[in-house]
Amino acid sequence: MSTMLIAVILLTLLALFFGVLLGFAALKFKVEGNPIVDELEAILPQTQCGQCGYPGCRPYAEAIANGDKVNKCPPGGTATMEKLASLMGVEPEPLNAEAQSQVKKVAYIREDECIGCTKCIQACPVDAIIGAGKLMHTVLTADCTGCDLCVEPCPVDCIDMIPVGQNLKNWNWRLNAIPVTLIQETPHEEKRG
């Protein structure tokens, strides 16, 4: 047998052995997550914006599971808060007062001042900023959640948070806010004649 063939067979057997060893270790030392936290995290909008006071949606879900309030997620809105309250078996509360008083804002990059450092792109949790290194960047306003995380890393301070007023182009129905009464039909008794 040639030396090359022996080396290939030996490396293949080593790779197979270590693969089986890693697979066994993954099963043996598996850490079970909290299923309630997983369900809560699935309900949250996954913007990782930090407006709730936690660094992301997973830490906020863990805090809710440990008894924190369910009304701290402005991007999720009332619908998300009601789903969280239903899952946790608590009464829905109005959204956090700070979140309600704020007008929706989106990031705006003054493109003539942008140096293309990409720090804002790296900071954006929803990939709402596009651009390339050494070229100007711009914000996709439809995707921007207004989390404000892109402002601080900008070395030339060319990002502003601009309030967005509602107009005919960006207004949409808040269907969950419309009160609806469900009426159940009762079977009518047959009239005897």
Curated annotation (Swiss-Prot):
Swiss-Prot/TrEMBL keywords: 4Fe-4S, Cell inner membrane, Cell membrane, Electron transport, Iron, Iron-sulfur, Membrane, Metal-binding, Repeat, Translocase, Transport
The keyword Mitochondrion belongs to this UniProt entry's keyword annotation: no
Enzyme Commission number(s) from the entry: 7.-.-.-
Region called Hydrophobic, residue ranges: 1-26
GO molecular function (one): 4 iron, 4 sulfur cluster binding
EC class of the enzyme, as a word: translocase
The 4Fe-4S domain, residue ranges: 32-90
Pfam families xrefs: Fer4_21 (PF14697), FeS (PF04060)
SUPFAM superfamilies (UniProt xref): 4Fe-4S ferredoxins
Gene Ontology cellular-component annotations: plasma membrane
InterPro entries according to UniProt: 4Fe-4S_dom, 4Fe4S_Fe-S-bd, 4Fe4S_Fe_S_CS, Elect_transpt_cplx_RnfB/RsxB, RnfB/RsxB_Proteobac, RnfB_subfamily
Residue ranges of the TM segments: none
4Fe-4S ferredoxin-type domain: residues covered: 105-134, 136-164
Binding-site residues, [4Fe-4S] cluster 1: C49, C52, C57, C73
Main location: membrane
UniProt-listed Gene3D superfamilies: 3.30.70.20, Electron transport complex subunit B, putative Fe-S cluster
Cofactors demanded by this protein: [4Fe-4S] cluster
Biological process according to GO: electron transport chain
Superkingdom of the organism of origin: Bacteria
Electron transport found in the keyword field: yes
HAMAP family: RsxB_RnfB
Assigned protein family: Belongs to the 4Fe4S bacterial-type ferredoxin family. RnfB subfamily.
Subunit structure: The complex is composed of six subunits: RnfA, RnfB, RnfC, RnfD, RnfE and RnfG.
PANTHER family, A to Z: ION-TRANSLOCATING OXIDOREDUCTASE COMPLEX SUBUNIT B, OXIDOREDUCTASE
Protein name, UniProt field: Ion-translocating oxidoreductase complex subunit B
Source organism of this protein record: Shewanella sp. (strain MR-7)
